[in-house]
Amino acid sequence: MELAMGKVNEVLFMNRGEGESSYAQNSSFTQQVASMARPALENAVKTLFSKDFHLQALNAADLGCAAGPNTFAVISTTKRMMEKKCRELNCQTLELQVYLNDLFGNDFNTLFKGLSSEVVGNKCEEVPCYVMGVPGSFHGRLFPRSSLHLVHSSYSVHWLTQAPKGLTSREGLALNKGKIYISKTSPPVVREAYLSQFHEDFTMFLNARSQEVVPNGCMVLILRGRKASDPSDMESCFTWELLAIAIAELVSQGLIDEDKLDTFNIPCYFPSLEEVKDIVERDGSFTIDHMEGFELDSLQMQENDKWVRGENFTKVVRAFTEPIISNQFGHEIMGKLYDKFTHIVVSDLEAKLPKTTSIILVLSKIDG
């Protein structure tokens, strides 16, 4: 079953709640990524004060916010930098309006439960902060024209609106048999389909934001990417490769129909810096102020016990993959699947899992 656009919008979300497998409890890696990207966000906020906006309120949106602590850090960082600039410039009191966006399946209840006074402060502070939820797909319009000064998105833009089109032959045969993402054994058409889908979706994202962001407004985007030119390089596909192996083992045990594996392709693409740069320049609505890639260990390397490291990695992966994986293969076998995944990860630790590459992209809306 290929995932079409409407279906992806229904099943793409992080594990809900605050339990052992929840995203809220297993977002330590994305917190590391956000920490690395924080200077870019701080600089973007400072830059906004150098532009002639005559601000009374700064409107900011966090797109694909999920329900972990990263969103709270974004709010706190933005608010803190606004307070600092207001003191430096002796400007009038500003207000901060933050819009938190994700798809309809997102756990907005857990998200808003976590919005303590430590995050948003109180309305008598230098920069009063107001927060609203905005459910919907960021691949389309979410806000009125020229209403946003700052857009932030972390580890969301690499998700696609649907599984790439054209991954079955005219005879209806799966072209990426036994895999759920690009791999070394995938034919060229699979790689081309994934890049084409990402190009289409990222262009839609930029087009929607070009209408919503004010001229000279900023976007800070952090997404999973790759350094290698080859999208099948283990650096960018190892998580999906190991998951496909785990699923295939359950197929061999008769617990999953082989056809379900052969027809499933994860709606996600990890682009290179060159691919992202090319799409932004082709769109022409934004200038690239800053762009860089950086690497982080995929596992908590300070933990010596390889089983603990493997189990921790599985929890992180399960938190962001279980909803969409269980929709395809069934909720009842998720325990067995992720146990199998842990064993595969631990065995691969002997060969050392590759580092994870992330991309920071800072854009300014072109005036005119």
From Swiss-Prot:
Enzyme Commission no: 2.1.1.160
Disulfide bond sites: none
Keyword match Transferase: yes
SUPFAM superfamilies per the UniProt record, alphabetical: S-adenosyl-L-methionine-dependent methyltransferases
Binding-site residues, caffeine: T30, Y155, H158, W159, R224, F320
Cofactor info, note text: Binds 1 Mg(2+) ion per subunit.
GO-annotated molecular function: caffeine synthase activity; metal ion binding
Catalysed reactions, semicolon-separated: theobromine + S-adenosyl-L-methionine = caffeine + S-adenosyl-L-homocysteine + H(+); 7-methylxanthine + S-adenosyl-L-methionine = theobromine + S-adenosyl-L-homocysteine + H(+)
Enzyme class, broadest EC rank: transferase
Positions marked as site (Involved in substrate discrimination): H152, R224, C268, V316, H331
Binding site for S-adenosyl-L-homocysteine: Y23, C65, N70, D102, L103, S137, F138
Cofactor(s) of this protein: Mg(2+)
Pathway as given in its UniProt record: Alkaloid biosynthesis
Binding residues annotated for Mg(2+), in chain numbering: N176, D262, F264, N265
InterPro entries tied to this protein: MeTrfase_7 (IPR005299), MeTrfase_capping (IPR042086), SAM-dependent_MTases_sf (IPR029063)
Keyword annotations: Magnesium, Metal-binding, Methyltransferase, Transferase
Family, as annotated: Belongs to the methyltransferase superfamily. Type-7 methyltransferase family.
Function, in words: Involved in the biosynthesis of caffeine. Catalyzes the conversion of 7-methylxanthine (7mX) to theobromine and of theobromine to caffeine.
Designated name of the protein: Caffeine synthase 3
